[in-house]
Amino acid sequence: MTLASSDPSAGATWPGRVLVVAAVVASGLLIVGPALRRRYPAAWWLLLGYPASAFRVARTWRALMAGCGLAVSRRPALTVVSGLVGNGAPPPQPRVPRHGFIRPTAAGFELVARLLPGQLPDDFVKAAPAMAEDWQVHAVRVTSLRPGVVRIAALYADPLAAPRAPRTRGPGRLLRVVVGTLETGASWVIDLRRIPHWLIVGATRSGKSTLIHALVAGLAPQRVALVGIDCKGGMELSLYGPRLSALATDRAQAVRLLSALVNLTLDRMTVCRTAGVRNIWGLAEKERPVPVVVIVDEIAELFLVAGRHEKDEAHAAGTALIRLAQLGAALGVFLVVAGQRVGSDLGPGVTALRAQLGGRVCHRVADPGTAEMTLGDLNPDALKAAQAITPEQAGTAVLASGDGWERGRSHLVTETDAEAVATAHAHLTPALPELSAALV
């Protein structure tokens, strides 16, 4: 009987072929990498950027932890003499925090690390710049996930360099607007149902007006009433004139308009109480009053005083704003207060109003006191980040709330764009005669 013979080299060719194919694919990806990154950055990141970054993290983790003082000796009580321990054994390797799976994200990657005994999340926060340098990424952000565990998020590029405006597909969810891009690459969303009142500050050419343009452009297609208070003669908010149900252009008009808004809010309270519901969202849709978004530009103009009469007006305006902030969320009245400068020197009413505005946005400001007033009571880290914004970073801001803080940049909506959007949706402007009468 003759046995069939096989060539042992035939099976050995398969590993070689696999290596050749892998080499060809890798070479091709490296060649087309620059073009792929420009045209399809997400695909480039998953195919090339993420694998290289994950390998870099795994390779440098132990040395990085030791260099940043995050390694702990296994036997600290031993005396080391001339690099030897005990009977000539080399010193034991120090313990380093363990990290989990390096998970890719749209803007980079993230991983969790378990702290060693005696370590704090702040120790990792201080090491974030070194991590970014060693891993060759744009930035690293460290947050506490739960006791003993931190989340380390890395960004391979700056998503705020050129944020892309979303494609408009209709009005979207009521009172929810995508106004820009966050540092994480996610959309920057202002949701007035979740955080009803906002304080937005920023110096000239900081991006404050652009953010307001983006917010109004997103609210204009929705079935809401927009009310403006612009005590600089209406120079800013008059762009949205066709879409505004009312616009006050000086402090006397503002006081009357705010008083009418308080009365409107109290009337809605009576309606809700009669219907046995806690807010307007509990009313039937046909009975529900239209939500009102009040935009106040340059809040300092309401509070600056030069005489007794102006002091009374400023006090009345401040009191009305505080009442709207306290009562408005449940009754469909929302505040967006903006200004170049906000400080306690404007009067106690400003501090009391600030406490009622849960959402804060701080662009580049001209004085540290404004940043302190905006963010200081929420998060000291957010305050430091806001003070680091440079004039070249127009549109970049730090946004903070009770949930934490993030950096973001608003989409570019020009004055021409804002005016066009307001005109296109002028037919959605609800008539509120009680507010119009206050301006006469």
Range-by-range predicted roles:
Residues 45-171, 175-178, 185-186, 344:
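N-terminal "pre-motor" subdomain/linker immediately upstream of P-loop NTPase catalytic cores
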Residues 119-121, 160-162, 198, 302, ...:
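Residue-level signal for secondary-structure boundary sites
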Residues 129-130, 141-144, 150, 156-169, ...:
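Conserved ATP-driven motor cores of ASCE-family P-loop NTPases powering translocation/secretion/packaging/pilus
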Residues 144-147, 198, 204, 210-216, ...:
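A short, charged
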Residues 146-154, 276-289, 340-342:
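Glycine/charge-rich, flexible interdomain linkers and switch-proximal surface loops
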Residues 1-12, 70, 80, 84-90, ...:
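Actinobacteria-biased recognition of intrinsically disordered, low-complexity terminal regions
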Residues 1-49, 167-275, 289-372, 380-383:
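P-loop NTPase catalytic phosphate-binding loop
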